């Protein structure tokens, strides 16, 4: 009992946690062969097992306060393990979806290459997410081992994702972690944070907010442009912001009325290697974290808060309560953010 009590005392966000394990879980969780649905008093979310996987499935993240949903393909959606440099010398030898074309509007002019793949969200096809029910939260964990690799690289690096949904909150906390089987001078993981924005000439959002670039109107996203052309963040090129927040203000495409902000907040700004916010048929919100030297057997990770907020000030308040964390741990007794 002493060990259990001590463990709970050091949990981050202690007000949301309870030792009253006998109380019923405040979430309704339904599960089929294809998906898991989590429904609480503040939000709903679907996690797919098959098809387009990882994170929260697009269009299913519901804010019960306002009735708005996310406007994209999903939240905290995961791609390849990558590094700087070109694959042109061996591109014809790369299996599957590992070739990385650049010098285009999709990927810009910065040479990058895949170390391992495939892109999990589109190519894994099926994952085995596990539900954890706590006294006042629900959580989902999942993992995947990459099975494609560039010439001279091994397969088998492991990706792990944890998502925790605290009762009564309009957001979830997540963490993505890579345990590497390859060495690299600057390995990074590519994901969508919070997620891309589907729109027709800005009809689904009224603003984008980037903590490193400020407020941006929809008129900036009417024509396609390359990632580095506008609103790009690159560690070592741009100053590291105090908070790393990327958000968009939802808008009802039928009425034009504003809804809540949907934000993705990386709790330790220093882990972000590069972050895009560019138009390519939709607003692409790719984020890459890591980008530092790594050896086989080592790991790197990032932690996020993703969800609905009424104002930028509210985002900042929540961010500041949890800033500096890079990981997340969970079991049936509780959860905690870790540094």
What are the roles of these predicted feature ranges?
Residues 27-39, 229-339:
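Beta-strand-rich recognition/accessory modules
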Residues 89, 115-117, 124-134, 147, ...:
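Catalytic cores of extracellular degradative/oxidative enzymes
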């Amino acid at each position: 009992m002493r060990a259990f009590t001590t463990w709970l005392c050091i949990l981050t966000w202690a007000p949301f946690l309870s030792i009253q394990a006998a109380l019923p879980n405040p979430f309704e969780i339904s599960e089929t062969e294809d998906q898991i649905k989590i429904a609480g008093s503040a939000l709903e979310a679907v996690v797919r097992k098959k098809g387009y996987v990882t994170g929260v499935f697009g269009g299913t993240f519901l804010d019960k306060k306002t009735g708005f949903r996310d406007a994209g393909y999903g939240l905290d959606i995961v791609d390849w393990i990558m590094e700087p440099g070109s694959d042109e010398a061996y591109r014809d030898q790369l299996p599957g979806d590992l070739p990385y074309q650049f010098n285009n509007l999709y990927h810009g002019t910065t040479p990058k290459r895949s170390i391992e793949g495939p892109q999990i969200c589109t190519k894994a096809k099926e994952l085995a997410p596990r539900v954890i029910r706590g006294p006042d939260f629900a959580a989902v964990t999942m993992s995947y081992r990459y099975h494609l690799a560039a010439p001279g690289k091994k397969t088998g690096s492991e990706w792990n994702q944890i998502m925790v949904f605290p009762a009564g909150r309009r957001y979830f906390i997540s963490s993505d972690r890579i345990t590497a089987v390859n060495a690299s001078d600057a390995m990074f993981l590519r994901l969508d944070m919070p997620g891309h924005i589907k729109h027709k000439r800005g009809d689904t959002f009224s603003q984008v907010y980037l903590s490193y670039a400020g407020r941006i109107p929809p008129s900036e996203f009417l024509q396609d442009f390359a990632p580095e052309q506008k609103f790009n963040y690159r560690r070592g090129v741009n100053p590291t912001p105090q908070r790393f927040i990327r958000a968009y203000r939802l808008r009802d495409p039928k009425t034009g009325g504003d809804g809540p902000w949907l934000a993705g907040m990386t709790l330790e700004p220093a882990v972000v290697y590069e972050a895009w916010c560019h138009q390519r048929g939709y607003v692409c919100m790719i984020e890459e974290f890591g980008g530092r030297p790594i050896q086989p057997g080592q790991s790197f990770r990032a932690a996020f808060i993703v969800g609905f907020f009424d104002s930028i000030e509210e985002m900042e308040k929540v961010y500041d309560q949890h800033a500096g964390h890079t990981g997340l741990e969970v079991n049936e007794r509780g959860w905690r953010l870790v540094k």
